[in-house]
Design a protein with these regions (language model features):
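Primarily recognizes the serine-hydrolase "nucleophile elbow" in alpha/beta-hydrolase
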Residues: 117-190
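Catalytic nucleophile-loop/oxyanion-hole region of alpha/beta-hydrolase
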Residues: 35, 73-80, 94-133, 267-272
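Short beta-strand/loop motif that positions the catalytic acidic residue
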Residues: 224-226, 230
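Conserved alpha/beta-hydrolase "acid-adjacent" motif
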Residues: 231-240
Length: 292
């Protein structure tokens, strides 16, 4: 039955219950894992290779969905495809929900804290999960690409690490796959729904939320993928991040995908990106010495 509710002046018609997502049979999936404090409803899905054990010490990747900071979910078709691809190739993948903006609700920096908490959660549970806590990467698309870049580029001295939970555990990652993300939120034509004011009203807030602000010579390696036909997030966003990484001497790869629009997965019709992404992750995660 449909019902109508009013939230902060918004009229919302509830949708029928969504169908249960279809997961492939050739990977193992742990559904709806609680990784945030008990008062939070957001969950994560974990993807494992079928043949693995806690002694395997596999590399891990956090997957951060897109959706303009106010939409999207951990078990959308694209996230299931990405998580399954990683698991089939010897990775443990953690696809997360995180705090989304709603109406005038200010979500920054809680959304970033959630992403960083996911990294901490993997490290804390490394023995049970069979992962190496010293080999963790992050991958995000669109708004998730922005958050993934922020996870990779910010350090404890920037004041953006969550105090709790597990404040003594590092949020750092070894590498980042940024898929058509926003590098400079002030230059993003669509108003970022996660921030309470405009760039003109709060330039320092926008600067603090921009990955470009935090590029340093010791930043982790980046793989940046962006469609040349993207009409939502201009490829210039990625080009600016590439320029900043190059200037700082940070290892990076930039793959403009000819004629690709916004919001593609690892297998857009224009080009199969799985070899590129897996090659990058293998180089910066799999081929590092395993933690003993």
């Amino acid at each position: 039955m449909l019902c109508l509710s009013l939230v902060a002046g918004w009229s919302v018609t509830a949708a029928e219950p969504a169908a249960t997502p279809a997961f492939p049979a050739d990977v193992r999936v742990e559904r709806a894992v609680a990784y945030l404090p008990t008062n939070r409803v957001e969950r994560a899905d974990l993807y494992f290779p079928l043949a693995t054990s806690p002694a395997a010490r596999l590399p891990a990747v956090v997957i951060i969905h897109g959706g303009g900071w106010n939409d999207g979910k951990r078990d959308a078709k694209r996230e299931i495809s990405t998580g399954s691809t990683l698991a089939r190739n010897g990775y443990v993948a953690m696809s997360i929900d995180y705090k989304l903006a709603w109406g005038k609700y200010v979500v920054w920096p809680t959304n970033l804290w959630d992403c960083k908490t996911a990294v901490r959660w993997l490290r804390k549970n490394a023995d049970r999960l069979g992962i190496d806590p010293n080999r963790i990467g992050v991958l995000g698309e669109s708004a998730g690409g922005h958050l993934a870049a922020m996870v990779a580029l910010t350090t404890p001295t920037d004041g953006l690490d969550p105090v709790e939970p597990d404040g003594d555990i590092s949020c750092g990652v070894n590498c980042c796959v940024d898929m058509y993300g926003i590098a400079d939120v002030a230059a993003f034509e669509q108003h970022p729904s996660m921030l309470p004011k405009t760039a003109a009203e709060a330039p320092e807030l926008y600067r603090a939320a921009a990955p470009l602000t935090y590029v340093r010579s010791n930043s982790p390696p980046f793989l940046i993928l962006h469609g040349t036909a993207d009409k939502l997030v201009s490829i210039d966003q990625s080009r600016r991040l590439v320029a900043a990484l190059e200037k700082a001497g940070v290892e990076h790869e930039f793959i403009p995908v000819p004629d690709a629009p916004h919001s593609f997965d690892l297998q857009p019709v224009q080009r199969d990106l799985r070899p590129v992404v897996l090659g990058f992750l293998d180089k910066h995660l799999r081929h590092l010495p395993a933690n003993k």
